[in-house]
Amino acid sequence: MYVLVLIHMCYHFTMKRKKLFVYFIFLSFIINFNFNININFVCSNVIQDVISIGNVDICVVNVNSDEAQECILNNEFGKLLLFVCNMNDAFSTTAKTHPENCPSRAFVNQSNPTENSPEVDTYSIYPNLFGTNENRLNDTYSLYSTPYSNMDIDFSCLCYGDKQDKVKHIMRINIKKTRKKIKGCDFGDNIPSKRDLTNSLSLNERSSCIIHAYSNDVLGINCFKKEINNSYNNNLELNPSNCFHDVYFGADLILNSKNVIPNSRVIPDPSSDVKLSRNHSFSSYLILPNNLTENIKISCTCKRDEFVGTMIIYTKNINSLMFDNNNNNNDEEQIFQNKYMKKKEYKKDEGNEYDKKMNTDDNYINNEEHHNNNQYNNYENKINNVNYNYDDISKYINEHYKNYDHEKNSKNSYKTNTNIHDQYDTYHYNNKYDLHSDRTRIRTRTFWQNLFGLSSSKYILFNNFLILFIFLIYIYST
């Protein structure tokens, strides 16, 4: 059919250009349509059902099947994603995978991968995938993933039986792009595209990170620099070692988080579910319950050599929303930094002068801490003794709504005190979308500029159209 169409086109080569263009479009459509049909026919794998049990999503392929089966699991934070290569002992079948060290290596964005498809190191592409730490997958493959990703991406591996090695089954996880980051502290000094937590710090100095947490919040901590074989990761410590399963309550008391915050949940779950690699053993996530009733202070720390980064979490129940004040945050952090910096100024060999100054500074710091403790106690008493009624709450909401509505309608309402870089990943944003950028915004290109590759400069645009106009006159005059 294609040959006849081409002969017909050659025979009428002298016809008007419009008809020639129509033939070309028609032929391209026919070829593309048949090509898509062939691709869909080749990729017609049998999609397996997903079984959900509690917090586990399970998908099973039968390695003894004569038809190629495909398991697809969509990323959902808090879910354990479990792939199973089902074997039949009666046939003495052994399950195999490709790549052999899946999930450390996998195929990325391959619709129908084969053994010859290019494979990549999973961690270098997407560090937020918590997988098994096995060199070889026997019959199961379990993983967690964080909800943050700066790209749409899918990872896949092949699963097959040694008695049926010509039929390759596919295990695939789909991860959707989202800009929203997790409330937490990243002490790994990571670039924005590899950071899924809102606050970025470095373990090149002593630092603290204070988080106010509420019901249903997801909190995270990370100590690891997400680069393979980076010297930053030498001598790292996460304390307590299984944070957030255990947390510091007070200065040095370690308690289980389920006892301190009932109905909370830690991701990853205990190592019996997922065997963590070293890359992921310095990260943890805490899911707070939807009925948080306690106002408490807990913490975990990251340590690198002599530098310590402390994550301090203040949990707040629903009553605390009426009195939440970010200024308390700054006071507590400032006291911490003042105490550290003042002690750092003195040397141990300065004798009596050193002791005199140190005592003076310690008294000053203790007075500050005493004042802060009194302020915190008054704050808690205010929360515990308050008796809310419907009118008070309605008045509070109405006042804050009016303030919000006034800001929303004001000329400068887009300017806020919150740093947008602490909430979203702007690593791939263009400068024209950045309201706080000092650079001149890029003009939007027109359809014709994109079509012909023309410059956005008005002078070059005029010259190009002039040349095009002269060329058209020459064509139609011949």
UniProtKB/Swiss-Prot annotation:
Localization per Swiss-Prot or TrEMBL: Cell surface; Cell membrane
Glycosylation sites noted in the Swiss-Prot or TrEMBL record: 109, 138, 229, 279, 291
InterPro entries for the chain: 6_CYS_dom, 6_CYS_dom_sf, Parasite_Repro/Invasion_Surf
Secretion signal span: 1-41
Lipid-substituted positions (GPI-anchor amidated serine): 455
Cellular component terms (Gene Ontology): cell surface; plasma membrane; side of membrane
SMART domains linked to this entry: s48_45
Domain 6-Cys: 42-178, 181-326
Disruption phenotype: Attenuated parasites that cannot commit to infection, even when they encounter with hepatocytes, resulting in continuous traversal of hepatocytes.
The keyword ATP-binding is assigned to this record: no
Mode of membrane association: Lipid-anchor; GPI-anchor
Disulfide bonds: 59-71, 85-159, 102-157, 185-209, 223-302, 243-300
Maturation-removed propeptide residues: 456-478
The entry's keywords: Cell membrane, Disulfide bond, Glycoprotein, GPI-anchor, Lipoprotein, Malaria, Membrane, Repeat, Signal
Function as written in the Swiss-Prot or TrEMBL entry: Involved in sporozoite infection of hepatocytes and replication therein.
Name of the protein in question: Sporozoite surface protein P36p
